[in-house]
A protein has these predicted regions:
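Bacterial N-terminal signal peptides
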Residues: 10-18
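CBM-like carbohydrate-recognition segments
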Residues: 28-87, 96-115, 119-134, 140-156, ...
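Bacterial N-terminal signal peptides that target proteins for export
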Residues: 1-11
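Extended ligand-binding clefts on enzyme/binding-domain cores
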Residues: 175-179, 186-292, 299-310, 322-351, ...
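His/Met- and acidic-residue-enriched segments that coordinate or traffic transition-metal cofactors
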Residues: 45-64, 68-81, 91, 120, ...
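Asp-box/WD-like beta-propeller blade repeats and closely related beta-sheet repeat scaffolds
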Residues: 149-185
C-alpha cells in the first residue's frame, strides 16, 4: 500500500493558504507580448562555436551549459514571463545552477518568482500551459519550505480537481499538456502527501492517451485535428517537439511519482516504449527532424524536440530505467550534434518557433523552451559523466 505520509516532504505549516493567493489578479499580458518574449530569429547569428567539446566529461558538459545559459540569461532575463514557453527554461536554469555550481541562474529564477509573487498567469485556471511554471515554484519550495511559494499554485490545482468535467472535451486535449501539468500535479502530491493529485493526473493522462496515442506507432498525435492528417509520403503526421514534450513529461512525472504508486508501472512501460521508438528515429546527424516519419519533407535538424528526447533518455539511463548500453550512444550522438548549433556568442539555434506541427525555421532561430530543454539535457548528461565506466 502507498504510504504517502512516509513519502511526503515535511511541511512546517499545512500551507496556510490564507497567506497565499493574491486577492486581486493582474491583467494577463497579450498573446503577442508573450509570443514575442519567447524568442527570435537572427538572420546573421555569426559562426558556430567550434571550441565546445562533445566529450561526456564534467568540464566539457558544464562549459557548454554555461555558454548557452549565459547568452540566454543576458538575452531574456529582462523580459521573463509566466508563460509556458519559459517553464522549461526556468527548470533548465535551476538545473544549470545545480550542475555548474553557479548560483546566478537559480537566483534569476527566484528573483522573478518573487517579482510575480509566486502567481500563475491569470484568466485560464484550468489550462495546463499556465500551470507549467508551477514546476519551478515547487522546486524552489523544496529548497525553502515557505508556504507562499506554492500557495497560489496549490489553490489553482485544487480548483482544477474540483471543477465540473466537460464530457465533450479532454482537459489535456493536446499532447504538449503532458509536460506542462502532470509533473506539477505529481510534485504537489510529493509536497503535500495527498494522493489526490496523483490520481487526478492519472485519470487525465489516460484520457489524453486514449485519444492521441497510437500504440502501433508508439507516438502521440499533437491533438485530435491531426488524427487524419498524413505526410507527403503517406505516413501519419507526428510532430517531433510534441512527442518530446510527452517523453520529457514522462521523465519528470516519474522522477517524483513514488515507486509504490499502483499505476507507476504503466508510466514506466509507456516511457520505455516511446524511448525505444524515438531512438530508432534518430537521424544520421544525431538529431531529429520536426516531422518524425517523413525525413524527406523536412530538411533541417531541430533542437527543441531533440533536446527533450535527449534529456528524457539521459534521465532514464541515470535512473536505471533504460539500458545504458543501448541508449548511451543515442544520447552521446545527440549531445554532440546539438553543440553544432551553438554560436560563438552562446545563441542556441535551429529551434522551431512556437507552433503545433512540423515547420520551417532558420539556423539562427532561438526560443527559450529549446534552451531550457538543452540545459535539462546537459544536467542529465553531466550525471552520466559521473557514472562508472564513463570517460572523464
Amino acid at each position: 500500500m502507498l504510504d504517502l505520509k512516509k513519502w511526503m516532504v515535511a511541511t512546517p505549516v499545512v500551507f496556510a493558504l490564507s497567506l497565499g493567493a493574491q486577492t486581486t489578479s493582474p491583467e494577463r499580458p497579450s498573446a503577442k507580448i508573450l509570443h514575442d518574449a519567447a524568442g527570435d530569429t537572427s538572420d546573421n547569428p555569426g559562426k558556430i562555436d567550434t571550441s565546445l567539446s562533445p566529450k561526456i566529461a564534467h568540464k566539457d558538459v558544464r562549459a557548454a551549459m554555461k555558454k548557452v545559459a549565459d547568452w540566454e540569461l543576458g538575452h531574456s532575463e529582462a523580459i521573463f514571463t509566466q508563460d509556458w514557453t519559459y517553464a522549461p527554461l526556468y527548470s533548465g536554469l535551476l538545473a544549470a545552477s545545480a550542475t555548474t555550481g553557479d548560483a546566478k541562474y537559480h537566483d534569476a529564477v527566484l528573483k522573478y518568482a518573487e517579482k510575480v509573487n509566486w502567481q500563475l498567469l491569470p484568466g485560464r485556471y484550468d489550462h495546463a500551459d499556465d500551470e507549467a511554471i508551477g514546476q519551478s515554484y515547487e522546486a524552489l519550495y523544496l529548497e525553502k519550505k515557505d508556504p507562499k511559494r506554492i500557495a497560489a499554485l496549490k489553490e489553482n490545482l485544487d480548483k482544477v480537481i474540483a471543477r465540473e468535467r466537460d464530457p465533450k472535451k479532454d482537459l489535456w486535449w493536446w499532447c504538449d499538456a503532458l509536460y506542462m501539468a502532470p509533473p506539477t500535479f505529481a510534485t504537489m502530491a510529493k509536497i503535500t502527501g495527498d494522493r489526490k493529485y496523483l490520481d487526478f493526473l492519472d485519470k487525465e493522462w489516460d484520457l489524453t492517451t486514449e485519444h492521441l496515442y497510437v500504440p502501433a506507432d508508439k507516438l502521440y498525435f499533437r491533438d485530435a485535428t491531426f488524427l487524419q492528417k498524413t505526410e507527403a509520403n503517406g505516413q501519419k503526421l507526428f510532430w517531433s517537439r510534441g512527442n518530446g514534450w510527452v517523453l520529457a513529461g514522462l521523465a519528470r512525472t516519474l522522477s517524483v511519482m513514488p515507486n509504490e504508486y499502483p499505476q507507476r508501472a504503466k508510466y514506466v512501460a509507456l516511457y520505455k516504449e516511446m524511448a525505444d521508438r524515438i531512438a530508432g528515429l534518430q537521424q544520421p546527424s544525431g538529431l531529429w527532424r520536426t516531422g518524425l516519419l517523413d525525413q524527406t519533407a523536412y530538411k533541417e535538424d531541430e533542437i527543441s524536440g531533440s533536446a527533450f528526447f535527449t534529456y528524457a533518455m539521459a534521465w532514464g539511463i541515470n535512473n536505471g530505467v533504460l539500458d545504458a548500453g543501448k541508449y548511451r550512444p543515442v544520447v552521446e550522438k545527440s549531445w554532440k550534434a546539438m553543440l553544432g548549433h551553438v554560436f560563438e556568442d552562446g545563441r542556441l539555434g535551429s529551434i522551431q518557433p512556437i507552433g503545433a506541427a512540423p515547420g520551417a525555421f532558420g539556423p539562427g532561430s532561438s526560443y527559450v523552451y529549446g534552451v531550457g530543454a538543452f540545459l535539462l539535457a546537459g544536467s542529465e548528461i553531466d550525471k552520466m559523466a559521473g557514472m562508472k565506466g564513463m570517460k572523464r
